[in-house]
């Protein structure tokens, strides 16, 4: 790679040496081809004579030609451009420019800094619009200082709406307890920061999510007593037990008419039926009672069937054992009476 690069550099140097021409002694100014072409033109003598005349007039009449280039403009230059069509320089002036004051004014700088540091200016003048100490409206500004609210006492806070200092609205820099007060007494502050822990609490304690609290704090907690928010229910022992529920608790589909007017004891007496000479209470209309009674009857039937099967198996075993004993006795008797 290095050998190829050196070869290319050598070729480039040879090419440049072939196309270049070393000039040891430069030619004179009169031998320039451009001047010779200009001299061959027909109007070359006229242009040369005019330039010579102008140079002669400037050298003879005006001994200081540099003063002719100095110009004084009435307005400051705002921009400088170039007109390529006319080959000229275009100057743009600022007609209504503010008169510059290059003197250092410490009061003006202090006012400017104070305005820059303040926040939330509503309709106040900017720092550039403040009257100068040498201007015509300086003394008028002093008279209107109360209106403009510049350089007030630190006790007079910003954004006051014509109220007395103790009842100011949205004043900055006051005590933390008096922030965003709506003309109220400090004891009746609304939306105060740093208020006590029991503010806007609905009868709750600080330890709201604590388990096993006292019965007095029964607002939406787990483990409340059984009689909380119950609608006409009986004692906890009779509510949703494995049996008959209370008849007057949200029963749907009850019969109307004569049956609805009967009492509970009369309904039970009417439902009693006789079977096999024994009085057995009929199944009540409650679906839970029906399901429980059906399960109980099925269980009793299964037990009876199992007991019957056991008794049959025992009887069969006894019969087998007795038959075997009889066979053995007969065989022994036959052997005894053989000749």
Curated annotation (Swiss-Prot):
Biased composition (Low complexity): 300-311
Positions of the propeptide removed during maturation: 23-110, 126-151, 205-212, 256-339
Keyword Isomerase: no
Record's signal peptide: 1-22
GO cellular component: extracellular space
Described purpose of this protein according to its UniProt entry: In insects, FMRFamide and related peptides have modulatory actions at skeletal neuromuscular junctions, and peptides that are immunologically related to FMRFamide are released into the circulation from neurohemal organs.
Name assigned to this protein: FMRFamide-related peptides
Organism classification: Eukaryota, Metazoa, Ecdysozoa, Arthropoda, Hexapoda
């Amino acid at each position: 790679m290095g050998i190829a690069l050196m070869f290319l550099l050598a070729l480039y140097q040879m090419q440049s040496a072939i196309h270049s021409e070393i000039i040891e002694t430069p030619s004179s100014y009169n031998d320039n081809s451009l001047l010779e072409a200009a001299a061959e033109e027909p109007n070359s003598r006229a242009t040369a004579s005019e330039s010579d005349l102008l140079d002669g007039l400037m050298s003879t009449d005006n001994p200081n030609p540099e003063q002719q280039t100095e110009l004084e403009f009435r307005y400051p230059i705002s921009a400088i451009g170039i007109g390529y069509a006319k080959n000229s320089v275009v100057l743009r002036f600022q007609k209504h420019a503010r008169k510059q004051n290059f003197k250092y004014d410490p009061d003006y700088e202090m006012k400017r800094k104070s305005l820059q540091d303040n926040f939330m200016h509503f309709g106040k003048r900017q720092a550039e619009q403040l009257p100068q100490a040498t201007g015509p409206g300086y003394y008028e500004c002093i008279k209107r200082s109360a209106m403009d609210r510049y350089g007030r006492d630190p006790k007079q806070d910003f954004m006051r709406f014509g109220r007395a200092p103790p009842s100011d609205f949205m004043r900055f820099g006051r005590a933390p307890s008096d922030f965003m007060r709506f003309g109220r007494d400090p004891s009746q502050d609304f939306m105060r920061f740093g208020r006590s822990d029991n503010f806007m609490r609905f009868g709750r304690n600080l330890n709201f999510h604590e388990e096993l609290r006292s019965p007095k704090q029964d607002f939406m907690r787990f483990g409340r007593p059984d009689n909380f928010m119950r609608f006409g229910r009986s004692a906890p022992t009779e509510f949703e037990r494995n049996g008959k529920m209370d008849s007057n608790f949200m029963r749907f589909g009850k019969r109307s008419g004569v049956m609805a007017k009967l009492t509970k004891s009369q309904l039970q007496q009417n439902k009693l039926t006789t079977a096999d000479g024994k009085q057995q209470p009929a199944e009540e209309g409650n679906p839970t009672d029906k399901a429980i009674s059906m399960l109980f009857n099925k269980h009793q039937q299964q037990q009876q069937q199992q007991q019957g099967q056991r008794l049959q198996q025992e009887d069969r075993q006894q019969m087998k054992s007795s038959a075997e004993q009889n066979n053995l006795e007969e065989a022994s008797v036959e052997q005894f009476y053989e000749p």
